[in-house]
């Protein structure tokens, strides 16, 4: 675990989640990321890293009823993640969230802003969810964890690097990429088991540090490091939008993947007030 823990961060929010879990009731565990978080449809649900983390909570807090919200979508980065997080994840009011975009984002100012905005949206939720950043990797060891670590440090977040953990083992000849991945980036069941175990090791460590203080003071969210522009993004469903002006456009919801406002009349006009 020592190699995988990029930063322990501030554990106050996680202690709050532990305290809530000890009381019983209902809690929500969330994960948002790309195809690694979603995982292949061929992989059994219980073998996916997010479900392995869910199992940790269920095992350690048997009195509590847990729900997992897996908000992973393949081939998407934190830019789209920041737009959809309210609908796909935060609407369920999660208590603990894993953020995984280190292999989908690029090392650019735009992605730094969207990654930060996504994190700020989660941290600003009324229930003050705990957040952990997870850094996966490609076959060549590349990802954008260095850029994301700067943001994580700014917000004092726990950060877990799958990349650091497996790269050390691979360099020592104790692990081959083919054992954990079927292609250049997507982990197989063994790779997911490693990722889930790394998160769970961190949770074990944090649980031992918890002193059951029922009067925790959650630190205020600091000013943005780069920008707060993506903190206020929102994804609108076309069906729910009411045009302020419409000439020749109709909403077509019949297609599975092509729902939206459509027109076959040249010169048609449609306007929305946002």
Regions found by a protein language model. Name each.
Residues 22, 48-71, 76, 80-211, ...:
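Alpha-helical cap/lid subdomain in secreted, periplasmic
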Residues 1-31, 37-44, 55-64, 174, ...:
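N-terminal secretory targeting modules
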Residues 35-38, 103-105:
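A short, flexible beta-alpha/helix-coil linker loop
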């Amino acid at each position: 675990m020592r190699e995988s823990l990029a930063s322990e961060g501030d554990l106050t929010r996680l202690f709050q989640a532990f305290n809530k879990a000890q009381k019983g009731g209902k809690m929500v565990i969330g994960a948002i990321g790309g195809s690694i978080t979603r995982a292949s449809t061929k992989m059994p649900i219980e073998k996916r890293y997010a479900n392995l983390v869910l199992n940790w909570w269920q095992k350690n807090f048997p009195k509590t009823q847990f729900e997992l919200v897996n908000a992973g979508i393949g081939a998407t980065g934190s830019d789209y993640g920041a737009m959809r997080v309210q609908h796909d994840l935060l609407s369920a009011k999660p208590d603990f969230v894993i953020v995984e975009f280190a292999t989908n984002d690029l090392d650019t100012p735009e992605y730094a802003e969207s990654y930060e905005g996504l994190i700020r949206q989660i941290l600003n939720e009324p229930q003050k969810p705990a957040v952990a950043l997870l850094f996966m990797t490609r076959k060549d060891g590349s990802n954008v964890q260095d850029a994301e670590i700067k943001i994580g440090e700014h917000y004092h977040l726990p950060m877990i690097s799958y990349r650091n953990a497996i790269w050390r083992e691979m360099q020592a000849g104790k692990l081959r990429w083919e054992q954990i991945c079927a292609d250049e980036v997507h982990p197989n069941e063994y790779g997911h088991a490693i990722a889930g175990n790394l998160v769970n090791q961190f949770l074990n460590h944090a649980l031992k540090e918890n002193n059951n203080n029922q009067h925790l003071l959650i630190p205020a969210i600091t000013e943005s490091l780069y920008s707060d522009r993506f903190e206020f993004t929102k994804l609108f469903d076309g069906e729910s939008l009411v045009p302020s002006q419409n000439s020749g456009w109709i909403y077509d919801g019949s297609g599975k993947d092509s729902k939206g406002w459509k027109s076959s009349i040249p010169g048609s006009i449609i306007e929305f007030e946002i």
